[in-house]
Amino acid sequence: MSIIIGIDHGYYAIKTAHCSFPAGLTSYGEHEPYTRQGLLEFGGCFFVCGSGRQPIQRDKTVNDNYYLLTLAAIAKEIQQRGLPPECSVRIAAGLPLTSFGRDKPKFKDYLLRSNQPVNYKFEGVEYSLSLIHI
């Protein structure tokens, strides 16, 4: 199954057609936090998505934060649509207009990493996704 998900990667919030959450991310390393809400498990580490807000990053590819927030947004959108957690995803990514032309190719490569499928857990549900187009 292949689906299209539009994601606006804003400085303040991550937005899809059916959800919006603050663009904050807290890392707990290898220690599971007290909450399951917004909990992302990826690469052996725990992150809480939507907690607070990050400082504005002119280049959103300098660390993994926006990649991890993208995985959370995909999981939330799949859950809202009632779709299976194993699928191929085409992302329609939104960037700020001021940097769209400059950052588009770099952001596309950033999201389309070579490790496919992407396996992770979000709020206790296991996902196995192939990101096939940005």
For each feature predicted by the language model, list its residue ranges.
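Nucleotide/phosphate-binding catalytic cleft detector across ATP-hydrolyzing
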Residues: 1-132
